[in-house]
Structures are given as structure tokens and as C-alpha cells.
Amino acid sequence: MKKMRLLAAMFAAAAMFASCSEDGPSMETAVVTFEGSEWTPFVASSFDATYTGSVATPDYVWKDSATSLTGPNIFSGGYFSGGWVVSSYNSNDLATYGDYTSDLYVYNASNENSMTRGGHNGSDTFLIGCGNKSDWGDYRPTLRFADGKARVVCGCYVNSTCYFLNIARNGNYSSPAIAEGQKVEIHATGYDAAGNETGTVTMTFAEKDKMITEWTAWDLSSLGEVVEVKFDMTGDVENEYGFSMPTYYAIDDVTVEWQAE
């Protein structure tokens, strides 16, 4: 059954972003699902931890075998400050799992507390991204091709974490809730081998009465061929130090394409 769900997720993702290769030369496509045995050592539940800082260490380095996609983590003063953690935690209980100690929980309306079927299309695992660029530094989560070869990141699926959704709706001691007329956006910026920007794609991630609560397709194909993509979160919800929302989100089923040799 798990294998069938994995295949279904791959087919669904490939179909959603099929236009990435239309009218082009012979292309190869892979969907990075974060499922299977090669990912098991990196899943947060293997560490018995629900908090990014308890999982992400300098030795926490994963790489997809089919595409060489990897996600280097950023540390400041010895502490995790931005990057990715593979997770399977999912819940609809914002009161219990809506603070920073459970920042690895993705929102799933169907489960009160589970470590299965929280990913896109009922899969089990996904990435939790954390970090942004601000006056305090550049801590944007980055997806990079470790072999340095440029590929097209056609798209992925995004969802809210319980932590983000709880603060967006209810606020907390460090951030107000999203008010009428305010919004939060996520951005993906592509870079070529020379470090030049290839473009930026922006999605409205949350407004007062319109928040992402399910896996939602995000088309990144306009970035073109890239060696890395940096993700950012911005918005006009602020405290005295600037943007105040938790800079967390989930992504899954990253579709990658490259020219066949």
C-alpha cells in the first residue's frame, strides 16, 4: 500500500508540472518525494524530536540519489538558523502542536496526531523549511544540486505548519495574528552556476481569511535552469523588530527536469 501511495504521488506531481518540458528537447524528469529507505535516517521521528533545532546539526546532510538535490543547513552562533528537516509529523490540533517546540508538524485536517499520511497525496514524509532573509542576516533555506549541474525545478507542493498557522490565526507573545489587509508571501529565487539570479516566483501564503491548509501546487518552472533555489518568507505582520511571523512552511514532491544525455 505504501508503495502504491508513493507511485501515485510521483505520477500526480509529474502530471501537474508536465508543461515544464513541452516543446523542448528530450528531457528526463524525477520527483523528489522524500520517501523510502534512503530518507529514513533523516526523518525527524528517527531522532524522537519534534523541534528543528534538535534534529538539524552540521552532520545532518541529505542528498537525493536520483537528482543530487540537497539542502544545506545554516548555523549562527552554533545554533540552527535556517534550512530543511525531513519530517512526518502532522496534526489538526493547533492548540497542542502550534508552538515552536512542535515546529516540525505540518497541518493536516484529517489527523489529530500522526506520523503517517501527512505528505502530499497521502505520502508520509516531506520537508519543513525554516528561515528567511532580513536585516539580521540571510538564512534562506536553499535547495541545491550537489553535483553543480543546472536543472529545471519545475515545481513543488507547499503547505502550512501547525506553528505558522496557529500564530497566523491567533498571534502569540512575539507576533500579532494576521489582520485584515495584511498578507504573508513566500518566494523562490533561482541562481545559475555563476551565482546570478535567474528569476523569482512569489506565492501569497496567508491572508486573514485565506490561509493554506492543504498541499498546494507551486509552479517554479519560470526560474529556468538553476543550480540552486533559495526560499524566503516576507510580509507586513510586524513587531518592533520587523517581520514577526514564524518563517516555517512545508514542501513536498519537488519535480526536477534535465536534458537527457
Label every model-predicted segment.
Residues 3-6, 14-41, 258-261:
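Bacterial Sec-dependent N-terminal signal peptides
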Residues 27-140, 148:
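N-terminal targeting leaders for non-cytosolic proteins
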Residues 141-144, 219:
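Short, T/G/N/S-enriched strand-turn elements that build extracellular solenoid repeat scaffolds
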Residues 148-155, 225-226:
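Extended extracellular/luminal ectodomain segments enriched in beta-structured repeat modules
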